[in-house]
Amino acid sequence: MVDITNFFKKTNKADSSQAFNRVRINIASPEQIRSWSYGEVTKPETINYRTFKPEKDGLFCAKIFGPVKDYECLCGKYKRMKYRGIVCEKCGVEVTTSKVRRERMGHIELASPIAHIWFVRSLPSRISILLDMNLKDLERVIYFEAYIVMDPGLSPLHKGDLLTEEMLQQAQNEYGEDNFIVGIGAEAIRTLLAELDLKSLRNALQEEVNNVINSDFKRKKILRRLKLIEDFIGSGNKPEWMIVTVLPIIPPELRPLVMLDAGRFASSDLNELYRRLINRNNRLKYLKKEEDGVPGIVLRNEQRMVQLSADTLFDNGKRGKAVKNSNKRPFKSLSDMLKGKQGRFRQNLLGKRVDYSGRSVIVVGPELKLHQCGLPKQMALELFKPFVYAELERCGIATTIKAAKRIVELGTPDVWNALAKVIKHHPVLLNRAPTLHCLSIQAFEPVLIEDKAIQLHPLVCTAFNADFDGDQMAVHVPLSTEAQLEARVLMMSTNNILSPANGRPIIVPDKDIVLGLYYLTLSIDGEVGEGRLFGSMAEIHHALFNKVVSLHSKIKFRKYIINADGDKVMALVNTTPGRLILGELLPDGDSISFDVVNKVMTKKGISAIVDMVYRYYGQKATVVFADKLMKLGFKYACMSGISFGMDDMIVPETKSKHVNDTLLEVQEFERQYSEGLITSGEKYNKVIDAWSRYTDRVANDMMKGIAAGDQTSVGLTNQERLNSIFMMADSEARSSVTQIKQLIGSKGLIAKASGEIIDRPILSNFCEGLTVFECFIGIPGTRKGLADTAVKTKVSGHLSRKLSESAHGYFVKREDCGTTNGLIITAVVEGGVIVVTLAEQVLGRVAVSNVYCPVTKVLILQQGEMIDEYKVELINTAGINSIKVRSVLTCELQEGVCAKCYGRDLSTGKLVAIGTAVGIVAAQSIGEPGTQLTMRTFHIGGAATRGVEASSFEAIVDGRVKIINPNFVVNSNNKSVIMSRSCEVILADNVGQEITRYKAQYGSILLVTDGQEVTKGTALVVWDPYAMPIVTEKSGYVMFKDMIDGVSVKDIIDESTGIVNRVIIEPKQGRGEVVLRPRICLLDQNKQPLTLSNGLEAEYFLPVNSILSVEEGVNVSAGDILARIPREFAGTKDITGGLPRVIELFEARKPKNHAVIAEIDGCVKFGKDYKSKRRLILQPNDESHEPIEYILPKGRHVTVNEGDVVKKGDMLIEGSPVLQDILKVMGVEALGLYIINEIQAVYRLQGVKIDNKHIEVIITRMLQKVEITDSGDSNFVIEEKVNKRAVINTNKKLKAKGLREAQYRPILQGITKASLQTESFISAASFQETTRVLTEAAIAGKVDKLEGLKENVIVGQTIPAGTGFYINEIKKIARQRDKEIIAARDAELQENNTEA
C-alpha cells in the first residue's frame, strides 16, 4: 500500500517504479511536511528580472527545488553528468536533472498557526463538531473577533465561553487577570483540539446517546460527533493537525512562471497567493520580534491577515468574497486546481491528450470491406513515422534515424513502400465524439487513399451514429504489440456485430441499402415473364439479361426445401427473380429457410436475417454476408431510380369528409359543455381525442392512397405506378408515417411551448401549404423542439456521466455464486396488450429451477441452463406464463456479480466472460439512447404525438374470460358496474393458459361474464377516460353532510355557458371549529342510514374538486354515479417528458404528487381530521401488528373507502409511489421490477430496446449501502450508512468470536449519492464535491483499494477489467507462488542451519 503523503518523499530515496495496490490519504502532521521539504522559503521573490535566475530562498529557489538546467548548478561551476549528485559549495544547488523541480517541495514556518479552511468551512465543519461549537462562534475566534475561555480557573466562566473585548475587560476587572486563561485565533483552537482525550470522549458520548430518547435532533448531533471521533481514532490522525503550523509549498514546475515576448511574464495564480502569504508571515515574524512591544490590536490584525491569505491559497471564495487579480478575475487557488472539468482530476488524469493521433472529415467508403477504413496517405505517414523510420533502416535504405528522417521529408517512392508494409495488418482505432458507448471506438485495418478525408464503411455508421454531412473522426494508433492484439481481437469492427445494449445486430443495412433491397424483393402483378418456371440461378440471370423476366415478375422456381417432417425435398416455390438473387447471398447450409427472404424486405426483416446468419453460421459468415448485402443494396438502389416529386404527394380525397365529421363531433362536445353535461376540462380532452382520431384516419387513408400508386396517368406499367414516398416509408428506409402525414395529410395537433396541446389542429399539410394563422400557431412548438435539443442533450450527457460514475467498479468476478434466488419474470402488458413477451425478457438469462411444459410435463429447461433462441421457441410453444431467472439483483457475491446471475453477454451472444466491466456497459447502454432521443426530438417539428386516451379493454385473441374478485352491482341501465379495486379480467386460451390480464378500474362497466367465450376485438370493460366516478353500492335517498355553501361546497358558474356546477372546495375553518368532511349519505325510506356489505354506514366522502352529479333527496339506484372527479390529461408523451422521469428514478427522488402505499394487509378506517390533512388508520389483519396511521393531504383523492380491505403494497392515494416505500414494504425484488418497468416504459415509447439486466446493474449500485439499526458489538454507529460488504465481513468476525452481530436494513440511494459515497475516495473526488470528499477521506484515513476503473486510470495502473483482470489474477498467483517458494527456501535454510 502507498500512503498518498509518501508520494512527496524525497525523490533520491523513493523508488518511483515500486508497484502498489492501495492508496491511503491522511492529514499531514507538521513533522511530515518538514520531512517532504528541501528547505524553507523565506522570501516572496520569484526570479531576478535582470538575470532571469531564481532568487535564493525565494519561491523558485534552485537550492531548495533543484537546478533550472539539467546537470548544471546555478552559478555554472559544475556542468554535465560527471558531477551528478554533487552539491555546489558556492550556490548550494545539487547537480541533477531539472525534472526534480516537478517533485521537490518547500515549506513556510508560520509565525502564527492557521486553521485549514477545508476543516472549518466544508460543511459540516469538522472542527466545530469536534469542539461542539457553533460554526459562527468558531469563525469569530479564528478571525480574531472574540476570545475563547481555555481554562476558567477560579472564575465562574465555563471552558469554551466566548468573550468580546469589552466582556474580557469586565471579567478581568471582576475576577482578576491571572485567575482564568483565554485565547484567540487558530492558536487557541489548536490548544483546545490538542487537549481532547478522544477515547474517553467517545465513551461519554456512547453513554449519552443511549440516554437520549425524546430528541431526534440531539441524538443525530451526538451520533455525528461520535462518528467523527471514531474516524480520528481509527485513522491515527491528531485533531490539532487540522490547524497548520508548517505550510508546504508545491514544486515550482507545477506553478510555472513563463516568460512572454517583450520581457513580460505570465505566472500561475498560486505564486501570487504564496507571495502574499510569505509577505504577511514575514511581517508578523518581524512584529513579534520587536522588543518595544507591538500593540495587541496590530499583532492580532496581522495574524488575521495571515489566516485570510492562507484561506485564499487553500480555497479562494470559500469564505466571503473571492480575492481577485488586477483583471477582476478571482485567483485560482489549490482547491480550484482540483475541482471541476478543468481541474486536475478530470482534465489531466481522466482526460489525457493522446499522441499518435489525427483527425479529419469522414466520407463514405462503399468499396471498403467491413474491417477496413480509408486513411489519407499524408495522415498515415505522419502517424506511422517512427515505424517508417524503423522499416527504412531495416531494409538498409537509411543507415541512421537522421537519414531516415531526411528520406521521409523528400517523400521518395521508398517511403510509400515502407509505409504500405508498415500499415499492413496494423489496426488503427477510429473514434467519433461524443463517445457514448463502446461502439464509438472501433478498430479497422487502414487502406491508403489519395484523398484527405477518412473513408468509413457505411455499415458501421449506426454504431458511430455518424453521417457524412461534415462529421469528423479521430484516428489513434495502438503502438505496443499488446495494444494491437487487443484492438484486433476485441475492438475490430468485425467483432462488434451485436449491440451490447440489446443483443441485436448493429451492422444492419440502413437508408439506401434498405431501399435497394426493398425494391429488389418487390413482387408486382402483370410483369413480363409472369408464371414462368425456372430450375437454376444461371437460367434466372440469363432471362434477366435478355429481359425475358423482370426482377419483380411472379415466377416459379425449383429448389430444395425442408418440409414439416424436417426432410430435404425438391419443390416448386412461388417467388421473384429479385428474391432469388437475394437468396444467393445466404451462406451455404439448410439452417435458414428460403421463406425468410421470400418476401418484401423491410429494415426489420433484413435485421432478422443478419441476426439469424449470426446465430446459425457465426461471425465470419455474418461479416461476409453483410458486405455482400450492402453492395447488393447499393446496386439496386441505384438501378431503381427512386426519387420523389410533387406528383408522388397524393393528398387523400377523404380528407375534407374527415374534417367535417370531426367538426360535427367537436360541435357536439361544445353543446354538451354549454348544457353543463361535461366540464371545461372534459370538453378539452374530448376535443383533443377527436382531432387525434381524425389525424389517425387521414393518415390511414393517405397510406392507402400512396400504396396504390399513380392510378390516374395513362400508359404506365405497374412498376412505374409505384409511389416513391410509400416505398421509402414502407421499407423503413427513411421517414415515418408521422412525417408523411405532415407532408400530405394534416400536420395535426400542435403543442405549445409549455407542453400543453392547442385544441385547434393545423388541418393543412406542407404540400398544400399552411395558412398564416396555422403557421403562427405552429411556430412556438417547432422552435421549442430545437431549443430543447440543446438543453436535453446536456441533461442526457450528465445522466450518462452519473451512471458511469456509479457503476464503473462493477465487474463479473466469478462463474457462479450458487444462489437459488431470482426474479419471477412475466410478460409486460399495457392496456391489455402484450408489449414485451416473456420470451424476449428471459432470452440470455439463466433458469433458477427446472421448467416443465404445463401440458405435457416435459422438461424444457434445466436448473442453471442459459435460455437461448431454441429454448425461447420451446417456451413460446409451451405457453408458459412466468419463469424464475437468475438476476444481478439477487446475486450473492459480495463484490461484483457472477456470470450465471448476469447471463448472456449481449455483444457476443455467449455467457459473459469473467472480468467483463458490466457496470460501464450498463451505464453506456442506458445513457446512449437518452442522448440519441433528445437529439431526435425536433424531427417531428413540434407536432403533438399524444395518443387517444384509452377507454376500454378489448380481447386481443379469441378465448375464455375469467374474472377475479368480481364485486359488481347492476345499475339502473342494467349495466354491471365494478365496485372492487382489485378486480381483474383474465383472457385464457382453450387449454386454460393465461394469455393476458386486465386490471379493471373502480367504477368501470363490465361487459362480459365469468367463463364467457369471446372473439378477438370484443370489448370486455369500458370506462370514462376523463373522469373518475364515485359510485353507490346501494339504492336509496341522497343526503348531503357537511356541505355548507361557500365553505365546503361552491356553485361554480361557467362564464361561457352559464351552467352551474356544484364543486367540493377546501373547507375554510378556524381553530377549534368542527372539522368538515363533505360526504353523501344514503338513507332508506324511513330516513335511516343504509348499511353497506362491510357493515359500515353508506357514506361516500368527496375529495376536493369533485363535481356532484346528484341533488339532495333524490332516489338513486345501485351503480349510479354520485359524483365524478375530473382527470386531466394534457401533456404530450415523449422522451422529453420521459428523460426527467428516468433521472427521477435513478436519483431515487420523491415524486411530486407521490402515492401512499399500505405497509400491511388490513382494513381501512378514517380517524379525526386535521385542518389540512386527513387521518387514515390501517387496522391490521394480524393482531400482533400495531395499527398504522397515515396523515394524507386533503386535496388528494383517496382511492379507498372506509371498511375497504387492502393488501400490502396497495395504493391509498394515487400517484407514483416513493421508491424507498416500495423497498421498505415490498422488498428488493419488487423494487427492482418496479424501477425496470417504469424505465422501460419511457424507452419503449421511443422504440428503444435496452435489456433489463443493464437497469438491474444500476439498481444494484443504488442498493450497495445499508443502515445500521443495532450496532451489536461492532464499532458501527446506529443510523450510520455503511457498505453492505463491510457489515457482512464485520458480522462474520463477530460471529466467529461469539459476539453480537450488527443488525441493518437495506437503503436506496440515488446514483449521485451512491457515487459520492463509494469506497474509493479517488473516484468520488473526481466526480463531484472534490473538497468535501477529500476532507472526509483525510480525517478517516481512508484506504482506496483501487478496485474500480477510474481510480486505476488516475494512478496510472492497468484497469482491473477485461485483459487487466486476468493480468491481475496472474500477478496474484505469481505473488502467492513466490511467497511459497521463499517460505520453502527459508524452511530449508533453517533446517540446514539446525543440522549444522
Curated annotation (Swiss-Prot):
Residues that bind Zn(2+) 2: C817, C891, C898, C901
Binding-site positions, Zn(2+) 1: C73, C75, C88, C91
Any Pfam family the entry gives: RNA_pol_Rpb1_3
SMART domains: RPOLA_N
Catalytic activity of the protein: RNA(n) + a ribonucleoside 5'-triphosphate = RNA(n+1) + diphosphate
Position of the signal peptide: none
Cofactor(s) this protein requires: Mg(2+); Zn(2+)
Gene Ontology annotations for the cellular component aspect, listed alphabetically: DNA-directed RNA polymerase complex
EC number per UniProt: 2.7.7.6
Keywords for this protein: DNA-directed RNA polymerase, Magnesium, Metal-binding, Nucleotidyltransferase, Transcription, Transferase, Zinc
Residues that coordinate or bind Mg(2+): D467, D469, D471
Positions of disulphide bridges: none
Presence of the UniProt keyword Magnesium in the record: yes
Enzyme class: transferase
Cofactor binding, per record: Binds 1 Mg(2+) ion per subunit. Binds 2 Zn(2+) ions per subunit.
Molecular-function GO terms, alphabetical: DNA binding; DNA-directed RNA polymerase activity; magnesium ion binding; zinc ion binding
Coiled coil spans: none
GO biological process: DNA-templated transcription
Subunit field text: The RNAP catalytic core consists of 2 alpha, 1 beta, 1 beta' and 1 omega subunit. When a sigma factor is associated with the core the holoenzyme is formed, which can initiate transcription.
Family: Belongs to the RNA polymerase beta' chain family.
Alphabetical list of PANTHER family matching this protein: DNA-DIRECTED RNA POLYMERASE, DNA-DIRECTED RNA POLYMERASE SUBUNIT BETA
Protein known as: DNA-directed RNA polymerase subunit beta'
Name of encoding gene: rpoC
